[in-house]
Amino acid sequence: MEPAAAATVQRLPELGREDRASAPAAAAAAAAAAAAAAAALAAAAGGGRSPEPALTPAAPSGGNGSGSGAREEAPGEAPPGPLPGRAGGAGRRRRRGAPQPIAGGAAPVPGAGGGANSLLLRRGRLKRNLSAAAAAASSSSSSSAAAASHSPGAAGLPASCSASASLCTRSLDRKTLLLKHRQTLQLQPSDRDWVRHQLQRGCVHVFDRHMASTYLRPVLCTLDTTAGEVAARLLQLGHKGGGVVKVLGQGPGAAAAREPAEPPPEAGPRLAPPEPRDSEVPPARSAPGAFGGPPRAPPADLPLPVGGPGGWSRRASPAPSDSSPGEPFVGGPVSSPRAPRPVVSDTESFSLSPSAESVSDRLDPYSSGGGSSSSSEELEADAASAPTGVPGQPRRPGHPAQPLPLPQTASSPQPQQKAPRAIDSPGGAVREGSCEEKAAAAVAPGGLQSTPGRSGVTAEKAPPPPPPPTLYVQLHGETTRRLEAEEKPLQIQNDYLFQLGFGELWRVQEEGMDSEIGCLIRFYAGKPHSTGSSERIQLSGMYNVRKGKMQLPVNRWTRRQVILCGTCLIVSSVKDSLTGKMHVLPLIGGKVEEVKKHQHCLAFSSSGPQSQTYYICFDTFTEYLRWLRQVSKVASQRISSVDLSCCSLEHLPANLFYSQDLTHLNLKQNFLRQNPSLPAARGLNELQRFTKLKSLNLSNNHLGDFPLAVCSIPTLAELNVSCNALRSVPAAVGVMHNLQTFLLDGNFLQSLPAELENMKQLSYLGLSFNEFTDIPEVLEKLTAVDKLCMSGNCVETLRLQALRKMPHIKHVDLRLNVIRKLIADEVDFLQHVTQLDLRDNKLGDLDAMIFNNIEVLHCERNQLVTLDICGYFLKALYASSNELVQLDVYPVPNYLSYMDVSRNRLENVPEWVCESRKLEVLDIGHNQICELPARLFCNSSLRKLLAGHNQLARLPERLERTSVEVLDVQHNQLLELPPNLLMKADSLRFLNASANKLESLPPATLSEETNSILQELYLTNNSLTDKCVPLLTGHPHLKILHMAYNRLQSFPASKMAKLEELEEIDLSGNKLKAIPTTIMNCRRMHTVIAHSNCIEVFPEVMQLPEIKCVDLSCNELSEVTLPENLPPKLQELDLTGNPRLVLDHKTLELLNNIRCFKIDQPSTGDASGAPAVWSHGYTEASGVKNKLCVAALSVNNFCDNREALYGVFDGDRNVEVPYLLQCTMSDILAEELQKTKNEEEYMVNTFIVMQRKLGTAGQKLGGAAVLCHIKHDPVDPGGSFTLTSANVGKCQTVLCRNGKPLPLSRSYIMSCEEELKRIKQHKAIITEDGKVNGVTESTRILGYTFLHPSVVPRPHVQSVLLTPQDEFFILGSKGLWDSLSVEEAVEAVRNVPDALAAAKKLCTLAQSYGCHDSISAVVVQLSVTEDSFCCCELSAGGAVPPPSPGIFPPSVNMVIKDRPSDGLGVPSSSSGMASEISSELSTSEMSSEVGSTASDEPPPGALSENSPAYPSEQRCMLHPICLSNSFQRQLSSATFSSAFSDNGLDSDDEEPIEGVFTNGSRVEVEVDIHCSRAKEKEKQQHLLQVPAEASDEGIVISANEDEPGLPRKADFSAVGTIGRRRANGSVAPQERSHNVIEVATDAPLRKPGGYFAAPAQPDPDDQFIIPPELEEEVKEIMKHHQEQQQQQQPPPPPQLQPQLPRHYQLDQLPDYYDTPL
């Protein structure tokens, strides 16, 4: 009978709130059954026989607990507001006294009603009325955590475990969590205006567990509002819906905040911060954040609260939400002696949209790491929470609460009951026991014993009064800290945002009003479930389970609830989840094995002679891996070891002391502190009870003072108290005689006590990242310590005398100090020091001869010019990144095996290097070495020689046999390799000779047989020809071949056939017309890269079985030949940059199945035109394990076609962060541009807001980013373009100006002195590889929020004005700039005309130079001229210039829409797609002679010296000024329609015109644009006075020129336009020559079919050609003709000359441009 009743109770939460209210009889029956079952099971559990379930009866209706979603209405109490998502009638007032079920449990009723069957029969009918929106009010997910104390639990599990089982499952499944409906109270404009009125105000978002469903409630407060005031206010509201809450507090600034504030005059966003008053000083950025500052004493211990005197109780008066709207509420709890009474008021207007899902829910859908959950539904009753009853609601006596036994785990051998809820006198409140921390699976013994009685529960002893309520704060999804009552939440939030990088308080204020901030900083009203639960549920879900042996056919697979709790596996015995008996399988000492016969199946077995086995089959491979990894860790644990790290502990959990035999205890990253107010059972003083403890980890807590209790543990051998803000070490530590490892890193220590000398067994003492200025003298007595670890301190002078007194010290680590010199007081040698680490100091020279036994020396990244070392026992020398010109080692180091002296200024290899007989690795790269000694190659032990980036002109001519396996001689000046190099170096496996001047290769053998084992050959960027290809066949084992950017014209098929083991080939940047078909013999080939060639036929690469990547971009492919089935491993195919390529629908459909398929988008009439001022190309390449961890962003028409945005993002080893940045960052920048126009401000804010947008992905992962924004300022009188670059990490931007690189980015790493100082202040640990906490080298990067505040997202920002001297700029990822210098990158792409080909070249060069990471490169070519700024005046009256250059017209329609009525649209030439109107925008003519093109010769100077210097003015692209030495060919495929032509001719009647292609309805014009560019403005001449030089064909003159004497009418409405627009849309007059290309004042009319009205085309016979011999005479006639025109033009009025000088120039412009070709 009990299971049936329990099953009935379990089904109750599935009903909607309205449905349950309509079935009181059924609910009563279920409640009666539940009560009977609970009594029986509780009696069984009380005997302690087995951990079977004990069900708790429902709470009294008068006081449903903190999780109850339904309640009764008190007399005179206003009904709760309609909550979103409720079923119909959810806001309806219920009659008083109506029984109501509790979420997750049964509703108590006075008497038993009908049976449970009636409810089951109606279940199907009632279920139809449920909707997804009702989840907040009816489903168990909305109140399971809050109703944990009322709902029936499972066997051996507390109620909260039962309630959160489904939550824990959902937290591992994003798709399920994204379907959750969690409402968020939205801020209204009036609320935001109230906050913006004063800088002292703000908003914090609090997850409020007191509401019927957990909401993210906005709380408006001031900087003086305390956490206690906010918590008290939320507690008073309780289950009432309410809206946005105002809590003004009692501070000095609260009085001003209470004054009614008139709304600001502007309704839109503020573009500038308001001027703060004197009292409104922004908080200091260095102020301690939520976790900073000295540790404060927490409140008294968290006792189990009960009602009674001194306890917190509810007022019987109406709650503040019951008062009339707008009426301020002044009040608080009646018995609140500790918390001040806040002045609070509810905002009148608030929104509860049923469909309004929290933004943080969308971006932060699943719980974060560190054991903390981001779900607001997983909140548990806090120990400091107030009474769970509702104000003014009567209590119904009776129904005592029963305790819940807990499952027995390895750390909790004895189950213990929770403290019961106590019910005081009528009208009192119902109290609930607090939950223990995540530390255990049971509660401490000695809890209160409850006795059922008529009037409730009688406590044997009166508990102490509970502490006042307060808030919890969580940073970046990790541990959660309890705020003290006097702490100020808004101040904590502001300090955190200032540390991120926001610079203004008003901007911090705006950011705080965004609910998405929860992934960075989050407040809770009540302790989050995962940090306050008494069990440790790690994984759970519903899976197919089978018990016993797999061979037995009796045991079948059944669907069961499975939970990994602590160190036990819990499996339910019935289908209804946790209602039946729970089977507990201890995993410590057990094993987990994979079951190969079943997919995604694991076998879990316990240890011992009576071990049991459970087979669990998971649904997905992801779940399978998650369970395998987690359970494997649990099974490998020891019983004597406890790990309670990252559990948000403020004191020691009571159940920790069950086992006194612990040997290893890990308590790192909690909030433990020295607090004398804590009782003895909870403080750190109780650590001495562990008499067998050997290892104790207390790092990253808030100790503040050294815990003296640990000194009383005699067996302690390892103690870690790092990062605890310790300022001194007490003398009592001297009694720990057995201590061997003592870690004190990351504190504020300046000295050590002398008593440390008593630690005779101490062998390791960590003193790194403290504040020592010298070596402590006490180390002289610690004779067992052999390593001095003092990195990251403040040592300026190293006194060797101190080391001389420590003969036991062998390893000295003094990196990251500020050592400038070494002082040797005596001549004696320091014979005991064998390893010396002086990296990242400020040494100018180093004489290490005194260390005559030195074996390993680290001195990288100093300022060394000379270095002297004793070589007797030297084994490894690391001296890179200095300024060495001299390196002496004496005597010859016979034991030296590794030597790195790269990135110095050495001009030759020291002679002693050739005599080091055991040298294996020599790195001399990035020096100034001109020659390598021949004896170096004779060293029989040398295996790896890195000599790249030097000035080598040749290698030793005749080499003897050498043992070198890796030879890198890239970036030198080699003209050839030694002829016998490849024959003598029979051990050579790797050769990189890229970036030299090689024209030939040495042979590998002189016969047909070869001994070559060469596997990798890199010859990129040389001058190799086809003659070198046959020599490659001498290397039959070749696997990787890079011969990009050479002079290859063919690759013989017979030679390719012999390279059968080839796996990767790169032949890009040559002149190949085909890839040989014999490539099919290379059956192992997986990568073929051949972009930037002349390949016309698609190679047979699709026949290769292992092919993964094919890059044939920037070729001349016209078709693609594919097999019926694509290769199974093909992942990437790049066919961009093939303009002749045409793919049919079937081929496209087949290729779209490839994971990464790239092809040019077809140009359409409505396609967006590419910029006339800039064009771009980008590429990406996979790195290690074929993972593409980079992404590129390119927006040509950013912000309404007036700007451009480009970006590169690098995730290092993760894929998720770069893609998030790519998809989100442009939208954020567009929003920030609406708030401020300052380049640095909107760029900085964009990066910081992106940190928030990363959500939980950015909590543990990160990525570098660079963003470039091109902006045109219409207000600027110069009309210039501004390029703004912002970067974090190692992604960088470089601008090419006048052929020279101009870096616009900066990498913030440990070599930056200011960054290193900041990192040291935050006491972060920098590992030996230069990474913050071993994670990242960059101190400014997006993501990695768990490293805050050491790592921040504030970028480096730099802005430059673009000039005509700016050619292009490059954006690159880390892999690109690690392989190429900025000078080489600029030089490599400067002569590449196509941006896509330029980006491809950079990527190929980086890969050939040794980069193995993912690479992304974006090349943006610029064409910024004086005429690009569009500052033309539109009328003689001084009209305002157009708002923007409008250089991105995606179509003619948009040009018409955006153009002023009296102005002109600005043209655009397409980069990658054709522009519809580019033929109208040309500023030159096309020759009518057959086969003739525009002359490439620059035009001569002007014929008239008196002509005005028009080019001095800035003009738009439609009104160009041709300067000298500039030629640009622009291919236009403009489409027109001849339907509206009025020339009286049919298309068939016209003679064909060369250069103009037409089919009667389309006209394609090929245009040659001459636009000159002068370096000196005074030498510039106007286009009309610059006729072209005579060509061989002669000069073309229009036959219908206007008569010289006819005056011309100036048209200011269309300045520079040739003729008037006709009704049919044509522009040029009919009598003009067809080679005159005009500019339309208005775009041609568009037909419905999508074509344009074509202008009339004159016949070629209307013009004549002047022979070359008459050119000079014609020039004189033209000159005379033009002079007469200028004389006839009247000058402007005198009064307009000084004010409108540019108008005068515009008046002189002719009506058309006719440049004779």
Curated annotation (Swiss-Prot):
A motif (PDZ-binding) lies at residues 1715-1717. Residues 536-636 form the PH domain. Its EC number is 3.1.3.16. LRR repeats lie at residues 638-659, 661-682, 692-712, 715-736, 738-760, 761-783, 784-804, 808-831, 832-853, 873-894, 895-916, 918-939, 941-962, 963-984, 987-1008, 1013-1033, 1037-1058, 1061-1082, 1084-1105, 1106-1127, 1129-1150. It is an enzyme of class 3 (hydrolase). The modification N-acetylmethionine is found at M1. Residues 346-358, 408-417 have a biased composition (Polar residues). Its cofactor is Mn(2+). This is PH domain leucine-rich repeat-containing protein phosphatase 1.
